[in-house]
């Protein structure tokens, strides 16, 4: 479950509670559109957190999120693109 991974990753890179909640909302919205199943939960959580950081103005890179989650930057980038497209996000 990617939602359970959000606090684990967030604690490693010190993001706000507000940003964590935003990431959880991104994941829930993606789940409604069936864009989460079959994807690595850690990669999905990292990408949702990256999107939330951008939206909340927290300066974190894809590399920061990838390292905190133990996934590659390519995974974060691919999930980010997928989420952005499915949710019509302007980030």
State where each predicted segment sits.
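A cyclin-like helical interaction fold
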Residues: 1-43, 50, 63-69, 73, ...
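Short, amphipathic alpha-helical "recognition" segments used to contact nucleic acids or chromatin
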Residues: 45-57
